Each structure stands twice: as structure tokens, then as C-alpha cells.
């Protein structure tokens, strides 16, 4: 027996020793904490081999049946806690907000794509608090929100007209509508067509960035050392795509901002979030470089976050009304009784239309726009229900699982607004989907009131003036669409067929009149 090992033997021995070392560390780390339950982990991979590439929220929801609503998993060396009930999410991210308000470090986005991270991706600190105050002043102030009503009403009129003229393109019209609303509010930019230069470019940019991977879960997020490797080395191919994404992202931030700065001081500029912030933070008409970067980023986030998710809820509404026409008829009867046939509903009618409010809640529940939310990060070790949650854990709110909680929502697959009728405030504390689809605690979406008003006005206006029905095939048979949603950060509705037409000649007249009406 030779005492001299060849190179292959040495590699095998070294590998075995390394695996033994990692396994020992893995076992000791697990023993140090009384972790929440979860699927069995293995050294090196953790649970990576058990997490699917697609529809992760559904897999995590299945795990709830076995492990409960707080699940611990480990992806390579990163600890994750999947939170799948409203109660647990509120206990952790709201009642213990001091510990749970941080964000994980989005390495790819923050170091390769964005000059500075947007507020939604920013870690907790003074700069985050400053930008949060900006949004609160523009999106959570009642008088400021009322100032956006003419924009909503003007664009609703254009949307109804487009739906009447070319109903088959309803998804494109809804997309244009939301983009137009947010561009006007963010920059004062008026959109006249779905081919608006900025909207088209922004759509391409967002698609490019989202194709890089999920929040804080790309290869370089797990292996930060890859940031130092040349682009040609294995595992570093993301750099080329990230460079292209950065160029596009910078341009997306610059195009509307440059246009607005050029127009400021002239009659061509419209009041907007950006003009307001420039006036607030400039000194003697001049902006510091840091302030300019923050204003551009904040306006970009307002557009990106406000247009895409709201569009999803609106297209989900069209799908739901196609599948459940009895819901539309019940809502139309309520609107006709309360509002009448001489005008379209306005936001002042909101409290008088309770069934419409139930429909909105059910839309949020039936297809939550961001199924896995945006992850939080636990700053320090914590203990919940007797379980240890290690500091640094990524806290993932499984919003989709919350919306499918059978203890809150019987028959979860069915679109049934009546489930929200007659519930008191205590019941709504956990059942109202607004309690979880907009985020939690200090990280709750500051644009939620604007988004909610936007969705309400869209639903009320379409139901009051339009009939949504099922399309027919060449043989005259009804085409019943399958409720199908794209896998991704945002749960977009898959394309489907339906019919949309004015309810009556009087409704058609109201649609024509609405294009010049800015009273919401």
C-alpha cells in the first residue's frame, strides 16, 4: 500500500475534509437555535433543491399544511423565514417593526443596475426615512390626493372611449391608462397614446431588469464574491445583462426628468411630484447632486410601482366579470340605484356602494398583485412562539398563501365578493386583503390610498357604462377563459378573450361626455 497520494486522491481527501467541516458547522448552527419547523435541510444546499423555479408561493403554501404558518428554510448559507398567515405577519413586521423593518441587501440591483437603490429596496436608515417623508407628503396627504382626482377622471374618460372603440385591445388600453395616470402625477407628463415614447421604453427597461432574477435571490446575491470576477468567467454572465439594464435604467430615470427641467419656468410644465420636490429641496433654485439623484429615483419608483401592480388588479377585474357575470349585474344594480343613469360614479360615491367595495376586496384576494411581497430583513435575533429566528434572516411574506387561508376564506378558488359582507372591524383586521397586499409595518406601500382610489374609480366607471361578457368561437360556443396568471414578481393575467360594449345608448353618451369631464 503506497503512502503517497496522487493529485486525484489529494483532491478527493481535501473535498471530503471540506464537506466534513461544512457538515459539522451546519449541524452545530442548527443545534444552536430552536428554529421554526421546515423541510429537512442538507449541507451546502440547505433547501435549495426543494424550492421550485416557478410558482414558489404555491409550494410554500402547501408546506403550511405540514409545518405551519412560520417556516424556516435555508438557501445555501442564507436563512429565510416564510410567513404565511396575516396574524404572524402582523405580529412580526408590524408589532415588532423595530426589528423587522430592514431590507436584505439587493446586491445585483444596488451595485450593478441602480445609481442608488430606490426607497423600496433601501435598507433602513436616515436616507430611507427622508424619502419616506417625501412620499408621505405626496401620497398620504388627503388634500394632495384630492388634487389628483382631475387626472384620474380625465384618463378614465379616455380609457372608456378607447374600450368602446376597440374593446379587443382592453389590456393595452388599461396599461396605457395606468401609465398615463402615474406619468402625470410623477412628472406632469401627458400621455396621448399607448405608443408614448417614455412608456414604451420604460416597459422594455422594467422587463430587462426583472429578467435578472427575483428580489435578493440572484446568483451574485448568494455568492457576493462573483462581483469581482471578470464577465467571461463561469457564473459571471449576469454582468453583461446587468450593464445593459443599468444603461436602460439610467435613461429611464433621465428622460422625463430632463424634459421637465427643460420646461420648468414655462407654461408647458404641469404641477407634479417632481416639480413639488424640486421646489422643496432646492436652494436658490439649485439642486445638490444627491438631491437630484433622489428625486429622479423617487419619481421613477412612483411610476414603476404605481402603474404595473394597479394594471394587474384592473385586468383581473375584467377576467372576474367575464367568469362571474352575476357579480357584475349585482354591482350594476347597486350603482344604478345609488348613482342613477344620468352620470358616472365619482369618488364621493364610495361610501354609498358597499357591494363595489366587496368586489375590490375580493379582487385583491383572488389575485394579489405581488404574491411573495417584498422581503424584509430581521436585524437581530428574535424569538416568536418559542422559536428562534436568527438575525439576518430574510422574512418573506407569502401574500398568496394569506389570500388562500381556509380559516379566513372558505372556498378560496371561487370569486365571491359576498364573503366580505356584514363583517365587523375585528373580522376585517385579518380578512381585509388591504391588510397584507400593500406590505407591512414601516414598509407598507405609501401609494396604497392612490392605488385604491384608482382601482375604485376604474371599477365603478366601467360597471356603470359597460357590459363585460364572454366571447364566442366560430361555432357560436361561449369561450370561458381559464383564470391563469403569469409566474413572476407581479402576477399578471394571461391574455384572454371577452366582449366589452356600452350598456345602452345613454351609457355611450356618458362615455362620450366623460372625455371632457375632470370631476372625480
From Swiss-Prot:
- Name the PROSITE patterns on file: CYTOCHROME_P450 (PS00086)
**Which E.C. number(s) belong to this protein?**
1.-.-.-
Binding of heme occurs at 445
Q: Which residues are glycosylated?
A: 6, 141, 270, 517
Question: Which Pfam families does the entry mention?
Answer: p450 (PF00067)
**What GO CC annotations are associated with the protein?**
membrane
Record function comment: Cytochrome P450 monooxygenase that is able to use delta(6)-protoilludene as a substrate to produce delta(6)-protoilludene-5-ol and an unidentified hydroxyprotoilludene. Is also able to use phenanthrene as a substrate for oxidation.
Which gene name does the record give? CYP176
- State the pathway, as annotated in the record: Secondary metabolite biosynthesis
Instruction: State what protein this is by name.
Output: Cytochrome P450 monooxygenase 176
